[in-house]
A protein has these predicted regions:
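Secretory-pathway ectodomains
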Residues: 25-354
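Bacterial Sec-dependent N-terminal signal peptides
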Residues: 1-28
Length: 354
């Protein structure tokens, strides 16, 4: 091999290394809990960020609030409840789960100091609620799984509708109606008074909820409100879809991750792109902890084999590969140029600068 060929070969090797090497990151925060083996063997934990606070529902049944800028602990409260579902915050009120004498309930806490305001007459919220005109609409463990309407001022459940395991799927809250899941691809239309809107029964359900005679059949709604169903659903969600869909919508796109396949829909359910995630990082071995983290109109971020992938779906190129194997992330949350994660190794909360 002559000198010029050797030089070219060397440059190609360097470029290959640079293109696949993971980016480094700096750990600027680590929480100080010490979890027992028993607590970590029953791993339920979650995070969210609201009004400058990182809210950490930890494996020790406490809810912690940290200042996201300096990492200081603002407050902590024992809830005797832990969940992979993050707490919800609106109008400086935290909606979280609480457990007393092995009875699980939803509860309100003050965002400012963590003090318990009151418990609610139903189980912990399973999806992000809608608060509108003094009413809370949400899904919860109530009468074995319902969508409920709760009057915040009167402290009463105004109405509820049994939807079985559909309570774990976020409803679609639209201007004049709610579309709630009632297991699998069955969806029921309700008005905000809890009245069933579909009485034609053009489509009948294939589940055991007798109080819901009429449904719509689809897997999910796209970013532009169209039903993803039939052949398209089978292609992007799989033919035997029963799990929670891994889906993110932006103003212009719908992103779906199923197994190793990323599907991107543009307007009117048009398939803009499909890509095998493993083809972007052939050096990594896929594991079960693969999920969408964030997406916008140019990039999508995916947690894959303890790495964070940033994929530009406009240029169809991998932009960045961040190695997170040190922390074995259980869940990841973006905050501007930083990420917060819960380690699957020790259960602690970490803050990393990218």
């Amino acid at each position: 091999m002559n000198f010029q060929l050797k030089k070219l070969f060397f440059v190609l090797i360097i470029l290959l290394f640079v293109s696949t090497a993971g980016f480094s990151q700096k750990e600027f925060f680590r929480s100080q809990q010490v979890f027992t083996k028993e607590q970590l063997s029953d791993f339920y934990s979650s995070i969210t960020i609201q009004d400058g606070l990182v809210l950490f529902n930890a494996n020790d049944y406490y809810l912690y609030a940290y200042d996201k800028n300096d990492g200081s602990l603002k407050w902590s409260v024992e809830t005797n409840y832990k969940s992979t579902i993050p707490v919800f915050v609106q109008d400086s009120i935290i909606y979280a789960g609480i457990s007393k004498k092995e009875i699980h309930q939803a509860a309100l806490f003050s965002l400012a100091d963590g003090k318990l305001i009151k418990t609610l007459p139903f189980g912990p919220l399973a999806t992000k609620p809608l608060i509108k005109n003094g009413m809370l609409y949400g899904t919860a463990i109530y009468d074995y799984g319902c969508i409920v309407a709760y009057d915040l001022k009167k402290d009463t459940v105004t109405w509820s509708r049994f939807i079985a395991h559909g309570y774990s799927r976020p409803p679609y809250y639209q201007q004049n109606k709610i579309m709630a899941n009632a297991e699998a691809d069955n969806w029921v239309e309700l008005d905000y008074d809890g009245v069933l809107l579909d009485t034609t029964c053009a489509v009948k359900p294939d589940f055991f909820v007798e109080a819901i005679p009429c449904v719509k059949k689809f897997t999910a709604l796209s970013h532009d409100g169209l039903e993803i169903k039939a052949k398209l659903s089978a292609d992007i969600f799989g033919k035997d879809f029963i799990d929670q869909p891994d889906i993110i919508t932006t103003k212009n796109f719908t992103f779906v991750l199923y197994n190793d396949k990323l599907s991107i829909l543009s307007g009117r359910l048009k398939k803009k792109q499909q890509v095998q995630v493993s083809s972007l990082v052939v050096e990594l071995v896929e594991n079960d902890n693969t999920k969408l983290v964030k997406a916008d109109n140019e990039n999508v971020w995916i947690l894959y084999s303890d790495h964070l992938l940033q994929y530009n779906h406009k240029t169809k190129k991998l932009v960045r590969l961040t190695n997170l194997t040190t922390w074995q992330p259980h869940s990841v949350l973006f905050d501007e140029e930083n990420i917060w994660l819960i380690s699957g190794k020790d259960g602690l909360l970490y803050g990393l600068s990218l």
